[in-house]
Amino acid sequence: CLTLWCSATIDDLNGWERIENNNEFAELESELSNCFQNLTKSLAATFSQVMIVTNEVGYGIVPELATTRFFRDQLGKLNIAVAAISGTAFQVTAGIPVRLK
């Protein structure tokens, strides 16, 4: 699950505390961008078929907390990056798949 991977990566970078205590958004965003690039490069280089599940984050309300807004924005960027290198992409709502790509 890409959502859990993103959350765990932020956790590995001590991101939640950094956002709450120091507002290190730019530095953390740069570190995450590097992690995202490494993931997408690895996915693009594999010869295996990979199915990735993630959460859609663009349809909801703007979160009140800075940490939640940061997470939503980063997951959105990661979703875009992974969809860009994917051969196909579907959005599934209420069990109904809609092909995006």
Name what the model sees in each region.
Residues C1:
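Conserved proline-anchored active-site loop of SAM-dependent methyltransferases
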